[in-house]
Amino acid sequence: MAIILDADVLIRGEKGTFNLQQWVAARPTEQFEVAAVTVAEFWHGVERATGARRAKRKQYLQTILASLPVIPYTEQTAYEHARVWAELESAGEMIGYYDIIVAATALERGSKVATFNLRHFAQVKGLAVIEPR
């Protein structure tokens, strides 16, 4: 079962508050991936940054893209996205739209999500969630 890294895991890795490289290296049998929507979130951060910060963020993102497969948003992802969205909305338990897409991507592939935002992702039925340590 692959592990899809949520944006918060990548952000903490970028900021140096979490040693992402060490955590991944300690799990050599695991396949790590990133959802396309997470790449969009990062590009947004790069585009908003200026000067040296922009260059640093861009380099970090390019390193991530060179080392992790990016999982596309497919028609099946769209179905899972709509299903999870409707389920959460009907229950009055909405989470962030990007989080729903990450969850849908994981559900479509039978993957886990690695996140520090356990509270949100735990609301998605059938989703395997792990907190990196």
Question: Residues of each region from the PLM?
Answer:
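Short, well-structured N-terminal submotif of metal-dependent ribonuclease cores
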Residues: 1-35, 46-63
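Alpha-helix capping/helix-boundary segments
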Residues: 9-10, 38, 77, 102, ...
